[in-house]
Amino acid sequence: SQPFFDDKNRAFWMLQSAGWTFYLMLRMASGVGNGVSLSFIIPVLVSAAAGYSITLVMGAIFRSLISRRPIVTWGGSLIIVMLAVAAYSAIDAWMFNMMNREGAGFNGSLFLGSVTINTLLLGAWSALYYGINFYIIVEKQTDQLAALESQATSAQLAMLRYQLNPHFL
């Protein structure tokens, strides 16, 4: 059996799908526990689908940022997270308004409340994305270092064998 992160693409899709499925189940359980009606399911499904899609876009952008200079990586990532939180919060607030306040205008306090939870959610997603990717980078560098050390040891042993060759003496 190969290590989980050997196929980085497969690992990403498995973690992405499992994470958002868990989020969906958690939100649904929270709604059921709070006694809300079944109409609550629709905004939760839309929210999870929007979050899944937004984090796919974030992942594609982060993939291009991760190899840049640190200031570009972290500055760009911060901007992307802020834009993603704004978009995700607007979708959540709009969906909640559509389902629960038919015909009501945009509610700024609902948007700000959504910003809080979505900042935590997308910030955690980003931290996991970078944490896992930096772990993979360090593992690859460790493997490369071990291979180089092995080559150096082999070269030293070959040199020693050559020096101890009786024909050399």
Model regions: which residues?
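Hydrophobic alpha-helices of bacterial signal-transduction systems
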Residues: S1-D143
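Cytosolic signal-transmission helices at domain junctions
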Residues: Y130-Y162
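Conserved phosphoacceptor histidine of two-component systems
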Residues: R161-L169
